[in-house]
């Protein structure tokens, strides 16, 4: 679709989404909201994409924050889902726990994994490791009956395929992992 405006990477996401109504991101979300398309992706402003996902398309009831995820191959030939990879650089523990639910549902529906193993990316496998955010997320996730929580994983387990099928982290850590591995590939 041809548009005459662009939401630049340096634009304030919410203001740009409201003001640049003939940008591809706003037009795309408009089509999505009207049911003219089934999905929408953009290589443009991540912030504007988040604004669009929260304003133009009604989020699933109960979802606190949307996420960006990526599916990566594992050394065992399987797949691993990593989320968040850049949308929310700071996440409350409740959001990380919710990503466990979202990731588990996605892994079942889209990757065909029957009982996906969900883990928190952390600096150690032990329950007591990590910052306050990771420890609090761990506590919430281990109590959840909505997914198969297997604990913490370290970066060395990201692509092993042996520990987890879904790995949850904040967008700062996830984006760092994503960019590091894409550069290494």
PLM segments and residue spans:
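Glycine-rich phosphate/diphosphate-binding loop of Rossmann-like nucleotide-binding domains
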Residues: 93-155
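Short, acidic/small-residue loops that bind anionic groups at enzyme active sites
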Residues: 52-84, 144-153
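Conserved small/polar residues in nucleotide/adenosyl-binding loops
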Residues: 180-185
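Short, glycine-/small-residue-rich phosphate/pyrophosphate-handling segment
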Residues: 73-105
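Phosphate/nucleotide-donor binding subsite
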Residues: 1-37
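Oxyanion-binding "anion nests"
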Residues: 138-178
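Short Gly/Thr/Asp-enriched flexible loops that form oxyanion-binding sites at enzyme active sites
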Residues: 42-64, 133, 179
């Amino acid at each position: 679709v041809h548009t005459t405006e662009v939401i630049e990477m340096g634009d304030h996401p919410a203001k740009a989404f409201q003001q640049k109504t003939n940008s591809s991101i706003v037009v795309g979300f408009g089509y999505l909201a009207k049911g003219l398309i089934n999905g929408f992706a953009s290589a443009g402003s991540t912030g504007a994409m988040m604004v669009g996902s929260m304003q133009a398309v009604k989020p699933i009831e109960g979802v606190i924050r949307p996420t960006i995820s990526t599916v990566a191959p594992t050394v065992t030939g399987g797949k691993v889902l990593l989320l968040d990879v850049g949308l929310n650089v700071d996440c409350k523990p409740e959001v990380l726990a919710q990503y466990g639910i979202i990731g588990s549902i996605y892994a079942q529906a889209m990757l065909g994994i029957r009982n996906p193993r969900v883990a928190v990316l952390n600096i150690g496998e032990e329950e007591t490791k990590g910052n306050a955010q990771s420890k609090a997320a761990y506590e919430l996730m281990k109590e959840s009956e909505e997914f198969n929580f297997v604990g913490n994983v370290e970066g060395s387990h990201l692509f092993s395929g042996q520990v987890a099928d879904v790995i949850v982290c904040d967008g700062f850590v996830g984006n760092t992992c994503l960019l590091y591995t894409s550069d290494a590939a």
